[in-house]
């Protein structure tokens, strides 16, 4: 792990950055066909970073055509597994060589604390690419038991051109979660980053070219959802879209697929994730540490954030006191200051959305136990709101900011009912000193990821995705991610 630098050293790196501004199509940078651009700004300061190419349907068409040519002529998919593996491992090496550059770029573009970009996002991005690269030559096809008169093979083939639509909260990491298995499988990709955070995806595309990934295999079209996302979702030569973002936008991609070529759609959408704390926990200080990290890491801009604390009434007050003590250690401020654990929210529009929920808490006359204030710019203190009922908007709606709602219960049946009282089902955490309670909570909570006595999402080897309106169609990460980027084919050879 690279050592953190001083704020001044990060600022010096920022001053030397050559920020990418144009779309990356067919192996090189190019302006948007219409010549339009949009402003990429630093959320912490409002400062203009770059005028980025604003792609539209024409640009998407060029990118898809480039990807389709690359797929059809086999310049990538026909390479041996060892050759694709070598290129992806080289890309991971290049990301490591440019780690500080990419970490600073990510922090400037997203408002994320540099300590998280450098010590979490970049290492996990690099590890994800290496993990999928190493998996390439360890996936076997199979034969079916049909007798000696025939040979029946069941094989997987790359699905084709894939549209990868990224969120703004983890631009680099979500890029790796998707390009890792997609490129490993032999697909060609067209990446549509969020307009709020387009810069690092463009830089990674450039590094991918240097790593030996052929022209046309890795394309990036920055732009808005209607202008670039919808044309990608509707394009007849796109075989699949993998989307991470809001449930509302996920529904649109299902519509685009239904109204075009019935392309495969994999959705990873929202979450309103519970942290259930039983009264038999052994270490409330440790529980408080995990709850605070789960709720406020990345400013709560995390689809798997533990935004609902569901706590047994007997330990509620003691736990809240410890949460308050933990929060005193969470500094908020300049994202390039490595002492800060909380940076700016991603945009003024998102800041106003989060602030509206703070106002809602006051309207409902709920107890704001900690935080609740905003600071100059678009900074929001980590906020804990107590006494939240299951009917409150704070309990039911995904806020995607540093706001933790607190609801108490009296027995495990009530806890499970509260945990499942949501349209989402992405993640959950359970804290208990009882193996019996741990097994029951982890089995009965309807979520794709359940952690016990910790907060997390597993590592690259474990699938990430959810139930209900949190998405469907596949999973990010792990060996299961590879399946969704392939088609299953049966080959029957009559040997009689």
Swiss-Prot record:
Keyword 4Fe-4S: no
Superkingdom classification of source: Bacteria
Protein's organism: Pseudomonas aeruginosa (strain ATCC 15692 / DSM 22644 / CIP 104116 / JCM 14847 / LMG 12228 / 1C / PRS 101 / PAO1)
Physiological role: NAD(+)-dependent aminoaldehyde dehydrogenase highly efficient with protonated aminoacetaldehyde (ACTAL) and 3-aminopropanaldehyde (APAL). Likely participates in a still uncharacterized metabolic pathway present in proteobacteria species, in which ACTAL might be an intermediate, yielding glycine. Highly prefers NAD(+) over NADP(+).
UniProt-listed Pfam families: Aldedh
Protein name: Aminoacetaldehyde dehydrogenase
DNA-binding among keywords: no
Top EC group: oxidoreductase
CDD domains reported in the protein's UniProt record: ALDH_GABALDH-PuuC
Family label: Belongs to the aldehyde dehydrogenase family.
């Amino acid at each position: 792990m690279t050592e953190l630098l001083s704020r001044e050293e990060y600022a010096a790196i920022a001053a030397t950055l050559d920020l990418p501004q144009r779309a990356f199509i067919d192996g090189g940078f190019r302006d948007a066909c219409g010549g339009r651009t949009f402003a990429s700004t630093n959320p912490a300061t409002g400062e203009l970073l770059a005028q980025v190419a604003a792609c539209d349907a024409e640009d998407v068409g060029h990118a898809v055509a480039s990807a389709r040519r690359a797929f059809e002529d086999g310049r990538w998919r026909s390479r041996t597994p060892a050759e694709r593996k070598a290129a992806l491992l080289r890309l991971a090496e290049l990301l490591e060589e440019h780690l500080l550059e990419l970490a600073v770029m990510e922090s400037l573009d997203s408002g994320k604390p540099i300590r998280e970009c450098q010590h979490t996002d970049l290492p996990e991005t690099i590890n994800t690419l290496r993990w999928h690269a190493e998996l390439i030559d360890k996936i076997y096809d199979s034969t079916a038991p049909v007798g000696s008169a025939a040979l029946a093979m069941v094989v997987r083939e790359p699905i084709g051109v894939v549209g990868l639509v990224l969120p703004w909260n983890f631009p680099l990491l979500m890029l790796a979660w998707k390009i890792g298995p997609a490129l490993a499988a032999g697909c060609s990709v067209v990446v549509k980053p969020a307009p709020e955070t387009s810069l690092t995806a463009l830089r990674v595309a450039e590094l991918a070219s240097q790593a030996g990934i052929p022209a046309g295999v890795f394309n990036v079209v920055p732009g808005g959802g209607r202008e670039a996302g919808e044309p990608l979702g509707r394009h007849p030569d796109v075989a699949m879209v993998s989307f991470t973002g809001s449930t509302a936008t996920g529904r649109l991609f299902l519509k685009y697929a239904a109204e075009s070529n019935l392309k495969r759609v994999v959705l990873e959408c929202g979450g309103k994730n519970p942290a259930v704390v039983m009264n038999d926990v052994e270490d409330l200080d440790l529980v408080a540490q995990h709850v605070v990290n789960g709720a406020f890491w990345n400013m709560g801009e995390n689809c798997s954030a533990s935004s609902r604390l569901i706590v047994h009434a007997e330990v509620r007050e003691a736990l809240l006191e410890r949460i308050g003590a933990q929060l005193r250690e969470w500094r908020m401020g300049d994202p390039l200051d490595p002492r800060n654990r909380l940076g700016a929210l991603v945009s003024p529009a998102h800041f106003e959305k989060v602030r509206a929920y703070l106002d809602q808490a006051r309207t409902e006359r709920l107890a704001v136990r900690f935080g609740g204030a905003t600071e100059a710019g678009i900074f929001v203190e980590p906020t804990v709101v107590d006494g939240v009922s299951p009917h409150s908007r704070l309990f039911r709606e995904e806020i995607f900011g540093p706001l933790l709602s607190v609801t108490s219960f009296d027995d495990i049946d009530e806890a499970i009912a509260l945990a499942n009282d949501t349209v989402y089902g992405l993640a959950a955490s359970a804290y208990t000193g009882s193996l019996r309670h741990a097994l029951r909570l982890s089995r009965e909570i309807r979520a794709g990821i359940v952690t016990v006595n910790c907060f997390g999402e597993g590592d690259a080897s474990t699938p990430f995705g959810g139930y209900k309106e949190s998405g469907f169609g596949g999973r990010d990460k792990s060996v299961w991610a590879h399946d969704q980027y392939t088609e299953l084919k049966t080959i029957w050879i009559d040997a009689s």
